Amino acid sequence: MKKLILSRLTVAILFIASPLGHLNAQPPIIQTKFTADPAPMVHKGMVYLYTTHDEDYAPEGMAGFRMKEWLLYTSTDMVNWTDHGTIADLYNFKWADPAVSGWGGFENGAWAPQCIERNGKFYLYCPVQGRGIGVLVADNPFGPFTDPLGKPLIGAEYDSIDPSVLIDDDGQAYLYWGNPNLWYVKLNEDMISCAGEITKDKLIRKIENQKDPYHFQEGPWAYKKNGHYYMAYASTCCPEGIGYAMGPSSVGPWEFKGYIMKPNRKSSGNHPGIIDYKGKSYVFGFNYRLNFMITDKHHERRSICVAELEYNPDGTIKELPWWDDGVAVEPVGTLNPYKRTEAETMAWSQGLKTAKDDKSGMYVTSIHNRDFLQVKAVDFGKGAKTFEVRAATITKGKIEIRLDDLDGTLLGVCDISNTGGWNTWKTFVTDVEKVGGVHDLYLVFRGGDGEMFNMDYWRFK
């Protein structure tokens, strides 16, 4: 409770001193959880962002990782992200279950994954720290994911963390991974077995006993664009930047080209994920900003960020400033408020958490007085007349519906009354001032002390 109070007080002071729009040019895109190791995938017009999860209770210090599951977020506009919760955890791998294996690293085992689609199946490559790299398979990107092998795909003896996958133009798939070495192997078309020998790349890693902060450390991200092969990576620790190399083939030889983002003392680690989406290129990574909004102590509680990426005519990449000094991405789409919008879809929030139950799936919880959520680029068209929300509570509260700022135009206030239980859901409706055009929407929560209600979804009519 003390930590929760500190978090709310600290964030409240920050927002009073600096309105949301000026908080920072490049804020973390997820605020309800600590997330890291972004693995974006584009599929049928949507971005699927697979992440690791740093637990809130991670202890102080740079070695205090607490990671037990993999999460999924989606977006169609690059600014509003929907939380789909846990899509896999260490229990998906029976060979990692401590009850079966006796393995003692379960509190810190679910490290950086990557998901890729092939022939209608989705393959989630997951490093189980200290045990190897496993692979899970599903029929759709939301899962459920299952382990087809019942054993690691790559054994623990090969620096087996941070997998990245590339399917080349000829259909040959490659799996890359490693720290401090870069390893790779060809995959068969089934994507769950290796074709040939595991190989250590001898050119890309740092030179022993030399201070060369731009070389490969970990977190490879392999991709091809406009005829060029790229290997992005977290550069020599610590702190880690995002470096990259280019080569003539999927296995190099790799030539160092520079930084995508230089190291910064504000962050110890890094992990790139790079995609093209709706005519633009993006790089994902992480910082520790949300952690330091709560405390001045270092905890391994990271937060994913994203920035637009630009290429030079020769294929090299323009260097970006550190996340805190960069430019926020612009929406590449709008949100339709007349369709059901899950409460866990947001661009920014204060004080909120997400949870899941069998009746409603994901929902927003931990709603207190003065908390809020923001949704960007909401297209009201010719105008809305009413606002409805599905909520559950044993107490009461209010939702202020505002435009473009925390104290922006007030469209209306929706009263939430006792529904008889925290998972007993009821729909509440209120009239709103007529509004049209594209705006940022703020749902600002008001009420007494303590938790007020849970929220499932909202929409305008």
Please name every model-derived segment.
Residues 1-26:
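Bacterial Sec-dependent N-terminal signal peptides
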Residues 23-413, 417-461:
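Carbohydrate-active catalytic/glycan-binding domains of CAZyme proteins
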